[in-house]
Amino acid sequence: MIVLLSPAKTLDYTKEFDVEPTAPAFLSDSAKLIKELKTKEPKDIASLMGLSDKLATLNFDRYQSWSAAKKMSADSQPALFVFQGDVYQGLQADTFNKKDITFAQKHLRILSGLYGELRPLDVIKPYRLEMGTKLKNSKGKNLYEFWGNKVQDNILKELKTNKSNLIVNLASKEYFTVVGSLPKEVEVVSPVFKDFKNDEYKLISFYAKKARGYMSHWMIKNKVTKSEDLKNFDAEGYKYSKKLSTESEPVFLRD
């Protein structure tokens, strides 16, 4: 079983942890993208990514100082602890013990515009490059064309290692698109989270992102590897709805 998450824009390099870091699988590809990004001025970055001048300058500096780091340093740390968005507030990686981290390293994958696919303990440098960015590159007009089948091939290889055909997709559509069209034998389960508001259950982005983190946390803590066990998820007030669910899209409601 592999769980897929999106990355986060908010990064934190101040945490302390006792782990053995790993290196991302596609560093040479990341370096090619950085080479492309290094040619951009702050104004180009602002236009390409829809950023303020301040954020564009920050990311210009990040690209200029980026290196294909394989070891930990002040600005090269495990993705699991660096990412700090809504999903990661729900994931609560700080609460994981060594068994949890070992399980996450085997089963959790973070999709990334710059790194393609990350294991939790893969070290990353500060960056911003969303998967939907229309960055022209050596392989095409966007990052989906750049990554091609690489991410899917790696995930299929990891599923084989895990003796499983299950992907639990907790990533956004923007990121999951990079995985491409999967073979029929692969089971993809994409949980949906809805909250009660104005007399109806609806998908509210902020809560749904956190819920993806809650479910990832719950799966890691409970060592869940089978799709039928997802129905037991009940963290933070969410409950499985048999009525609204399908096999590929289990629905969880919260009042």
Residue ranges and their predicted role:
Residues 93-246, 251-255:
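Internal, well-folded beta-alpha domain core
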Residues 4-95:
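Active-site helix-to-loop segments that bind/position phosphate- or nucleotide-bearing substrates
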